[in-house]
Structure formats: structure tokens, C-alpha cells
Amino acid sequence: MLFSVSDPFLGMRVTTVLILLCFLASLYAWTANPVTVQNDLVFSLSNLLAGRVWTVVTAIFVHANLLHLVGNMIFLYVFGSTLEGVADSKRMLLAFFLGGIVSFLLSLPFFPSDATFVGASAAIFTLTAVVMLMKPLRFSFLLLMPVGLVAVLYFLYNAAAVYYHLQSDVAYVSHIIGFSLGLPLGIAWSPQWKRNLLVSIGLLAAYFVLLYLITTYVLPLFL
């Protein structure tokens, strides 16, 4: 079987808990006193220097708005459940928190000293890199493509945003850092990581070929 498909709810107990925590933390942050949120929940250089080191963890669960939250939770569901299914919950948690915490810390030099950081995006990027090197052909019905292809496209978009200095509230650099942190984990956990990397690149090539064929030969038939 070329693409592996499994029960989407199999082996995702930790993923479910993380998603619930993100929803609860975000809902609290949206309704709480802004000063409390700024000092006790979001991550920033000032909070770190003030000794509020827990914010490097709490900030992972807090999201800026509903769109930010829902978008991240979709990708957390896809990649978190996949990693739990092919590895185990402990490795999934290790990748998630390592990616989130270290990405926040390493992002500080790239942003103004008064910048604040929230969201699970960087942690999820760590998961995408691990999954890409472990199970790239796992098909996601939610995203309608293999997870290896999603990971590569996800990375390329953010790399392009960094290269072209796209102005946005999104911390693209943090995403790239998170993805980079996931690569050594994927290499360590997957004996076939080289093959899986080539598979992911092959999926990307096939995607662009298909896109070219559709735009060149199919779309003109309807225009």
C-alpha cells in the first residue's frame, strides 16, 4: 500500500490534551486582564530577565486570536496524532516542548527587545520535521495530501517569507528554527530517514508537475 491510512483517533491521547490546553489557555488569555497576560502568560525578553521563566512554556498554549488558534490546532492534530501513532506519546511530547521552548529562546536575537511571543507554531514545526523523516506517506484526509508533502510546502512557504522579509505578525524565523530542531530528532528516531527525505522531495516534485499539468491543460478547458 503506497499511502498508509489509519484510524485518525488512534494513538493521539497526548495530542488531544495539548489541543484542549491550547483552547483553554487561549480563551483565558482573551478574557483575562491584559497586564496579567503580558506578565504571566506570554513570552518576552523582559519576562525572561524578570525571572518569569515559566512563560516560555505557557506562551506555547496561548494564541493571539481564533484564526491563529484554529489554524495551529489543525496542524497539531495532523502531525501530533501521526507522530503518536508511528512513535509514542513520550517522543511526541519531547519534540513538542523542545521545539516550542528552544525556538522561543533562539528567536530572541531576531526580534526587537520588546517583542512578545505566543502560539504553538514553532513546536508544531518541530513535529512536521520529525514526521517528514519518519512517515512521509501517511495521508491526511483533513489536508488532502500526504503529510510529507505538507511538511515540505509548510517549510518552503516560511523560508520564502523569511528570505523576502515578508512583513507580518507571524514569527516566520521561529518556525524555521522549530523545523530545524525537528530534523535531528527525526534522524535519530528513523533508520530510514534518508529514504523518507527523498520521498518527501519526490512528493514535492510530483505536486508541482501535477500543478503544471492542471494549469496548462485542464484549466483552459473551463475558461
Indicate residue ranges for each PLM-predicted region.
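A detector for small-residue-rich transmembrane helices and their helix-helix packing motifs
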Residues: 1-223
